[in-house]
Amino acid sequence: MSRELQDVDLAEVKPLVEKGETITGLLQEFDVQEQDIETLHGSIHVTLCGTPKGNRPVILTYHDIGMNHKTCYNPLFNSEDMQEITQHFAVCHVDAPGQQDGAASFPTGYMYPSMDQLAEMLPGVLQQFGLKSIIGMGTGAGAYILTRFALNNPEMVEGLVLINVNPCAEGWMDWAASKISGWTQALPDMVVSHLFGKEEMQNNVEVVHAYRHHVMNDMNPGNLQLFINAYNGRRDLEIERPMPGAHTVTLQCPALLVVGDSSPAVDAVVECNSKLDPTKTTLLKMADCGGLPQISQPAKLAEAFKYFVQGMGYMPSASMTRLMRSRTASGSSVTSLEGARSRSHTSEGTRSRSHTSEGTRLDIIPNSGGPGSSAGPNSTEVSC
C-alpha cells in the first residue's frame, strides 16, 4: 500500500489491571461462572460472564502468551463503550492451561498441548455450557488458536476479531533466535519483546514496566514457558486467498484483523490479511498504538467491535457512538465496517474521512491485501 496512514490525536494509556480489579468487579451486574473443564487434551479454565441468550453467539476470548484473560481483556471489557455490547452477549473467557491466576505447576513430564490441540479443546467448552456458536476475540497466540478452531469448526464460529494474528509457523531462523534468547534473556524480557515494539518500549516505559512486573510476580514461570514453547512450535495455518475455480482453505466467517501501527506484529497481520477472503475481511490499523490495542485504546477497539457485530446483523438498534454521530452529521455514507467492506471495489485513490470533536479519524482505504491479488475484489483497510 503506497498511501501512508495518518496518526490520530487521541492516545489512551491505561494499566493492564487496575489495583484491586477482578473479573467479578468488571461485570458485576452479570452472573459469573468459573469452571475447570475437562477436554480431549486436559483441563482448561473458563470464566463465563452473563447468561447465553437463545441462539445468539457468545463472545469467546483467548489471550496471548504472558497473559491470562484478566490482564489481556479487563481494560477492554471494563470500558464504558463495551458495556452496551456485553448487555447483548454473554462473554466466555478461556485461559490456556496453567495461565490462570493462582495456577499450580504442572507435574514433571507433563506434555503441554500443542497449538492444534489447544484449538481442539474448545468444542468441549462450548458443549459444557450448551453453546452453539461464538464470536471469537483472540490476541497473538489466542488469535492463532481461534483461527485454527474456526478452520476446523466453521459452523461454530460466526465471526472473528483477531489482534496481532500470525498465520505462519516460526521460521528456522526465528526458532534459532528464540532458542538463543532463551539462553540469554530472562522470561519477562522475552515476553515483553513479543508484545511491544522498540518505539513503544521507549515511549511507554510505565506500561512496559507494569507488564514486566506482572510476568515476574503473577505468572507461573514454568507453565508460561510451556505455553511459549507451544506457540513457537505452531504450524503454518495453510490458508490462501480464495480464487475463482480454485479449491482453497480460508476462513468462512467475517473477520476483523486489528493491529497497532507500531506493533511488532504489523507484517504478520498484513500477511494474514492477504490470505483471507477480501469480501469478508477488514484490516484495522490503529494509529498511535502499539502491541496491545485492547489495553492502550479500549474505547476505539470497542467501537470497531460494535460496528463489526452490527455488520453481522446483531444490535441493529444500538445507540450511535461519537464517531457514528459525527459521520451522520457530516453526511458520510460510511456507516459501519461492514458497510465499508461492501464498497471495497472502488479505486485505490478513494478515501473516506470522518472527524470527531476529539480529533479521532477513521479512514477507509481500499486495500488489495497483497501483490498478485488485483484480479479479485479488494479487502478494506481501516485506519483510526
Swiss-Prot record:
Region entry 2 X 10 AA tandem repeats of G-[PST]-R-S-R-S-H-T-S-E, spans: 339-358
Matching InterPro entries: AB_hydrolase_fold, NDRG
Keywords associated with the record: Acetylation, Cell membrane, Cytoplasm, Cytoskeleton, Membrane, Microtubule, Nucleus, Phosphoprotein, Repeat
Pfam families the UniProt entry points to: Ndr (PF03096)
UniProt key word Repeat: yes
Segments passing through the bilayer: none
GO cellular component term of the entry, any: nucleus
Stretch list, region Disordered: 325-384
Post-translational modification: Under stress conditions, phosphorylated in the C-terminal on many serine and threonine residues. Phosphorylated in vitro by PKA. Phosphorylation enhanced by increased intracellular cAMP levels. Homocysteine induces dephosphorylation. Phosphorylation by SGK1 is cell cycle dependent.
Disulfide bonds: none
Localization per Swiss-Prot or TrEMBL: Cytoplasm, Cytosol; Cytoplasm, Cytoskeleton, Microtubule organizing center, Centrosome; Nucleus; Cell membrane
GO biological process: signal transduction
Annotated Sequence repeat ranges: 339-348, 349-358
Entry annotated with the keyword Magnesium: no
SUPFAM superfamilies: alpha/beta-Hydrolases (SSF53474)
Modified residues (N-acetylserine): S2
Sites bearing Phosphoserine, chain numbering: S2, S319, S326, S330, S332, S333, S336, S342, S352
UniProt-listed PANTHER family: N-MYC DOWNSTREAM REGULATED (PTHR11034)
The name this protein goes by in its record: Protein NDRG1
Protein source organism: Bos taurus (Bovine)
Lineage: Eukaryota, Metazoa, Chordata, Craniata, Vertebrata
Gene coding for it: NDRG1
